[in-house]
From Swiss-Prot:
Name of the protein this chain belongs to: Arginine--tRNA ligase
SUPFAM superfamilies: Anticodon-binding domain of a subclass of class I aminoacyl-tRNA synthetases (SSF47323), Arginyl-tRNA synthetase (ArgRS), N-terminal 'additional' domain (SSF55190), Nucleotidylyl transferase (SSF52374)
Record bears the keyword Cell membrane: no
Organism, scientific name: Bacillus velezensis (strain DSM 23117 / BGSC 10A6 / LMG 26770 / FZB42) (Bacillus amyloliquefaciens subsp. plantarum)
Self-association and partners: Monomer.
Family recorded in the similarity comment: Belongs to the class-I aminoacyl-tRNA synthetase family.
GO cellular component: cytoplasm
Length: 556
């Protein structure tokens, strides 16, 4: 816990102490102290509505209660400069900001660990995200899901959760048969032979590339093989090619996975039959009209769902239930799925299945990733100018750069539609948020280099009484808010909270830089203290950028 968090806790305790001293309530009656940061600086550093919360207990008007709390409050212990009462009884606290300088050495000593909290207390969470069919390139929705999912995992880990990142490989469905048939067509074409493309075949450039590679490596060997043997080989070859490409693309996008889980393994290991039997034993499965049904309405779904069709084939739902049962059998406390907007209607039946298996409500959470629209020169862009086809993740990275893609996708709430401005993403101006943040980091590194050239190294054991300007205190307050931003992002599953924080920190840094002189040759002690403040800012900004997968350049 850093000094800013400690002082906030002290302030809460002193508010309780003032309530007791004023005789407004017994200790057991005092509600949790809520502290908010006012939007306007003129309203103080913190504000509480404790007076309104106590009105019924104390049987007094909130404003009178607020006056009694203020009169009984010990300002010294909580480093309070002054207090005032606003509106019906809000109490505003103005801090004596000198305590903030204690934050500098604590950040310097914590280094890459600064921002870590333990709100997760080691809870085991599995996050499954991307999970695109291995039949083509990753599109914009996949890219946004990858960026959001990875940032969420990083934030959860920083907040003390035990996180596992998983990619579910859809390698057992009809789409893989179609992949094999499509590869076969392109293989024959590469040999100058004709074969009709299936109506629902895959026509991407990658399939053409697979066909050409097969022709180069094996010649016409497969033309003369039995179709079943040829299909089996093309299925395996095509799947491996596409998976290798997916892994490579995601690795280049700075999105690692701990587990790549094959759907086929559910069939091979008997997991599907086990899941069906588990539901049957609990009385949630019945037979009707020749089909096997899951009684999902018991758990809030709008209708019961078919698990096995009349022809004996499984619906998508049964293997998915088996997969989620397997996740929980592996010992995870909570599951988070990051799904595309087209899966919205699928959520109630999956949550029903988890409950039907005997797990508590809320064990499965689903984060929905909404659609992305690209804009260039103010116009909506549907196709890539280079390929004439839908824009892929690779295309977007080539167009604006990896950092811009990661930052922009982590910048908005995932469940809102996103307009991605390509011109803004490549502009070198303060209007471009990723440039603004990275330039702040590079600017700090430049100042630290200048200090080193003059023999001025930042350290944790300096005299920080030189830090006393309003801009310095604003910067320190923002630095002190990083652990809280991480905690909120983790608890609410909103990684964009960190991106918002990055912008606030960059703004505070630029504002300080434009108002103050960091290195003063006439005052080396003050210069070293300010360079230490710069180092603390650099550590915080770097740690925050890492959480969303964006680099922190030392030069720009």
């Amino acid at each position: 816990m850093n000094i800013a968090e400690q002082m906030k806790d002290v302030l809460k305790e002193e508010i309780k102490a003032a309530v007791l001293k004023a005789g407004l309530a017994d200790e057991s009656q005092i509600p949790s102290v809520l502290l908010e940061t006012p939007k306007e600086k003129t309203h103080g550093d913190y504000s509480t509505n404790m007076a309104m919360q106590l009105a019924r207990i104390a049987k007094k008007a909130p404003r009178q209660i607020a006056e009694e709390i203020v009169a009984s409050f010990d300002k010294g212990k909580a480093s309070i400069e002054k207090m005032d009462i606003a509106g019906p009884g809000f109490i505003n606290f103005y801090m004596n900001n000198s305590y903030l300088t204690k934050l500098i050495p604590s950040v310097l000593e914590a280094g890459e660990h600064y921002g870590e909290t333990n709100i997760g207390q080691g809870e085991k969470i599995q996050v499954e995200f991307v999970s695109a069919n291995p039949t083509g390139d990753l599109h914009l929705g996949h890219a946004r899901g990858a960026a959001v999912g990875d940032a969420l995992c990083s934030v959860l880990s920083k907040a003390g959760y035990d996180v596992s990142r998983e990619y579910y490989i859809n390698d057992a469905g009809n789409q893989i048969n179609n992949l094999a048939l499509s590869v076969e067509v392109r293989y024959f074409e590469a040999l100058g032979l004709e074969k009709p493309m299936p109506e629902d075949g895959y026509r991407g450039e990658d399939i053409i590339a697979i066909g050409k590679k097969l022709a180069e490596d094996f010649g016409d060997r497969f033309v003369h093989e039995e179709e079943s043997e040829r299909q089996a080989f093309f299925r395996e070859y095509g799947l491996k090619y596409e998976l290798d490409k997916l892994r490579s693309d995601l690795e280049n996008f700075r999105v690692p996975f701990d587990v790549w889980y094959s759907e086929t393994s559910l069939y091979e290991n008997g997991k599907i039959d086990q899941a069906l039997e588990a539901l049957r034993e609990k009385g949630h499965v019945y037979e009707e009209d020749g089909a096997t049904w899951f009684r999902s309405t018991t758990f809030g779904d709008d209708k019961d769902r078919v698990l096995i069709k009349k022809d004996g084939s499984y619906t998508y739902l049964l293997p998915d239930i088996a997969y989620h049962k397997d996740k929980l059998d592996r010992g995870f406390d909570k599951l988070i799925n990051v799904w595309g907007a087209d899966h919205h209607g699928y959520i109630p039946r999956m949550k029903a299945a988890i409950e039907a298996l005997g797990y508590k409500k809320g064990t499965l959470e689903v984060e929905i990733i909404q659609l992305v629209h690209l804009y260039k020169n103010g116009e909506k862009m549907k196709m890539s100018k280079r390929t004439g086809k839908a824009v892929t993740m690779r295309d977007l990275i080539e167009e604006v750069g990896l950092d811009a893609v990661r930052y922009f996708f982590a910048m908005r709430s995932a469940d809102t539609h996103m307009d991605f401005d390509l011109d803004l993403a490549v502009s070198t101006s303060n209007e471009n948020p990723v440039y603004y943040a990275q330039y702040a980091h590079a600017r700090i590194c430049s100042m630290l280099r200048q200090g080193e050239e003059q023999g001025l190294k930042p350290a944790a054991d300096l005299d920080f009484s030189h830090i006393q300007s309003e801009k310095e205190y604003d910067l320190l307050k923002t630095i002190g808010g990083f652990p809280e931003a991480v905690a909120e992002a983790a608890e609410k599953r909103i990684p964009h909270r960190v991106t918002n924080y990055i912008y606030d920190l960059a703004s505070a840094l630029h504002s300080f830089y434009n108002a103050e002189k960091v290195i003063d040759p006439e005052n080396k002690e003050k210069s070293r203290a300010r360079l230490a403040l710069m180092k603390a800012t650099q550590i915080t900004l770097n740690n925050a950028l890492q959480l969303i997968g964006v680099s922190a350049p030392e030069k720009m």
